[in-house]
């Protein structure tokens, strides 16, 4: 899944927001009951940072999720990968390009569900739509934060 969004802001302000794991809750739908559980979490992300949280993505079933910031170049990109959670694979690239009058933010998400054919069926029936809804919510929140002056 790939998503692009133009933000009418400078790279410093966009980066300050997206590189703080404490802002994840602000761009996650309330019904997901997102709670960061990492003790003493740093203000800003860094390569090797582990972020643990509880989230209820489907049927209000709470689950633990742990991601690691595996790669990062300030004002350019960062990558988070699931270390524990509902996916067999979760690799999320966040790319930032300075453009005239703003920043183009691109999300590239590669993921795979466990359980073979059952996982594929579950994806078709529930997961794909849920992920699209989450990223639509994030798009709208980022739009309100950076594009409505």
What do the predicted segments below correspond to?
Residues 7-9, 55-59, 71, 86, ...:
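Beta-strand elements of well-folded, non-transmembrane domains
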Residues 82-133:
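Beta-strand/loop substructures that line and gate deep hydrophobic ligand-binding cavities in soluble
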Residues 1-2, 62-66, 89-92:
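Short, surface-exposed coil-to-beta transition loops
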Residues 10-11, 70-77, 95-104:
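A short, structured loop/turn motif at beta-sheet edges
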Residues 1-46:
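Hydrophobic ligand-binding cavity/cleft-lining segments
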Residues 36-84, 137-140, 144-148:
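Glycine-rich portal/gate segments that line the openings of hydrophobic small-molecule binding cavities
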């Amino acid at each position: 899944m790939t998503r692009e969004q133009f933000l009418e802001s400078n790279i410093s302000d966009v980066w300050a927001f997206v590189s703080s794991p404490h802002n994840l809750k602000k761009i996650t739908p309330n019904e997901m009951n997102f709670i960061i559980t990492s003790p003493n979490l740093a203000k800003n992300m860094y390569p090797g940072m582990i972020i643990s949280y509880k989230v209820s993505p489907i049927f209000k079933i709470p689950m633990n999720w742990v991601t690691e910031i595996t790669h990062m170049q300030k004002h350019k990109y960062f990558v988070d990968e699931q270390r524990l959670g509902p996916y067999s694979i979760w690799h999320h690239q966040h790319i930032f390009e300075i453009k005239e009058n703003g920043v183009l933010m691109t999300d590239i998400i590669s993921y795979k569900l466990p359980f073979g054919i059952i996982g594929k069926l579950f994806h078709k029936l529930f997961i794909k739509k849920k992920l699209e809804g989450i990223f639509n919510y994030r798009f709208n929140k980022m739009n309100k934060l950076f594009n409505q002056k």
